[in-house]
Amino acid sequence: MASEDWLGLNGSVWREVMCKWSVAILVSLHDGPMNFSGLAKRLGVSNKVLSKKLRRLSGLSLISESYGGKGYMLTDAGLELSQLLKPLVAEGVSPAVIQAVLRCKWMPQILRALWLRDMFASELAGSFEEISWKVFSERMKKLEEFQLIHRYVIPSHPVRVKYGLEARGRVVVRWMLQRGALLREKFLELQRSQRPGELIQAPDNVL
């Protein structure tokens, strides 16, 4: 997926936090501190990956140790981010879907285009000048897998396919419209707070 996103954020902090496990960790710690084994069990992640993510989130001052160094809790900055993301999880959108959609260049734009009305596939793809049909098809397939959109066939000659938002897709678009600007502001604050060279970018294969 493209590293450039719908909020115009493509820096290392954005890439680091908007990954599958980082989002899941922030959301899991929203309701209170947890120890390492509890987090690993809840997330179903290996100890190696969890350790790496916890170190990086700690380096960003989003989490800190608690219980005398035996557990982890959110900092004020981490809590602010988790409070922005938590409403999506409460509506049934998983952390994995959140990061996949928000980090993608095209998925948020596609969802927003479908916000007002259903659209034919060719019409929807044509509304984005820079997207190829191959990339468009891949993104639509993913959005269907995430149960954010649905498609239906119009019995015409030739047969045409039309797309619309699922209820969960409407939840995501509503969240983007209501909280997108604030999310961008929080990430810019976080980016400014980092000293040059302080954050090591995460390799794509661990996201």
Segments (PLM) and residue ranges:
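Transmembrane alpha-helices
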Residues: 39, 44, 50, 54, ...
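Amphipathic alpha-helical dimerization/coiled-coil segments
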Residues: 83-127, 171-207
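Short, hydrophobic-biased segments on the C-terminal half of alpha helices
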Residues: 23-26, 51-55, 140-144
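Basic, amphipathic "hinge/linker" alpha-helix immediately C-terminal to the N-terminal HTH DNA-binding motif
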Residues: 67-88, 157-176
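A short, conserved structural fragment
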Residues: 58-67, 144-154
